[in-house]
């Protein structure tokens, strides 16, 4: 069974101060984050419209690629 992007993202939470960890920490606080989806477009649209904590969509794109590689 494939895990959702959110589940993958939660593995990156922690005290480190880098863009990926910051994204994971902030997404964990976002009660409306689409937690069950594996759909790039649904996540991308949500983040563009609702996630003021994500300063750059390139961060999401890079993590999406890592998610796909780790979720085969």
UniProtKB/Swiss-Prot annotation:
Matches recorded under Pfam families: YozE_SAM_like
Domain of life of the organism encoding this protein: Bacteria
InterPro entries, per the entry: UPF0346, YozE_SAM-like, YozE_SAM-like_sf
Sequence similarity: Belongs to the UPF0346 family.
Protein's name according to its UniProt entry: UPF0346 protein EF_1680
Organism: Enterococcus faecalis (strain ATCC 700802 / V583)
Lineage of the organism: Bacteria, Bacillati, Bacillota, Bacilli, Lactobacillales
């Amino acid at each position: 069974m494939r895990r959702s992007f959110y589940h993958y993202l939660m593995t990156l939470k922690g005290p480190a101060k880098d863009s990926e960890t910051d994204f994971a920490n902030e997404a964990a606080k976002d009660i409306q984050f689409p937690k069950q989806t594996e759909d790039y477009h649904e996540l991308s649209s949500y983040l563009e419209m609702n996630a003021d904590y994500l300063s750059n969509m390139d961060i999401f794109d890079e993590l999406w690629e890592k998610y796909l590689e780790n979720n085969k």
